[in-house]
């Protein structure tokens, strides 16, 4: 669903969004044929199917030009929520509405084909993110220069390190010039010099009244960059509000849990 892109409009609106996944138990050493037979059996035997709710009844909105942080423990639903925002997943219930074009930079290399070269992946990702062939050609040199991968651009992606993946993925995403930029732990990989270059480009993006959604375990980064934040806990939204308030509440709970664990041990 798309929202109007007028200057006073909200950039993102989620209403009662839920997403669940079926739990499938496959023996560790099952053959491919055994796996297919097992999946077909489970599909037919619907009454015995088990599901896990990765995101449960989440509602919030983000204003245009705001930066939203998403925090929570591992397994709390952060990555699933980002994939819902990106349109990779469709919600089982509720609605996700975005104003304008989105550039998702989620799990590193998620949209890259490992057997394609960096050059080929720039073209494919540019098309996926909405650029025309002419626009990709026009921005190609800038993307390569920003990624600092000139020497490796004709190597297959499977030869890239995780840092190199991030360099190229960020360079493509930021040069698409989107209205909404989704970033999932992207600055946790790579050297500090490149991370600083990414932060400078993010600042320019933010100053241009664009919207950013940022997942990070770095509380300092959430405080520095984000206007508001969402705290997810087992798929549910525990808190939504000013970033500093949400981070403080999250850290208080972590501190209490740590003290309780120490007493038990």
Which residues fall in each region the model found?
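Conserved catalytic segment of ABC-fold P-loop ATPases
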Residues: 224-231
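Pre-NBD coupling/linker segments of ABC/ABC-like ATPases
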Residues: 1-54, 243-264
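The feature captures the beta-strand-to-loop junction immediately N-terminal to the Walker
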Residues: 71-73
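Conserved ABC ATPase "signature" C-loop
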Residues: 234-235, 250
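H-loop/switch region of ABC-family ATPase nucleotide-binding domains
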Residues: 216-217
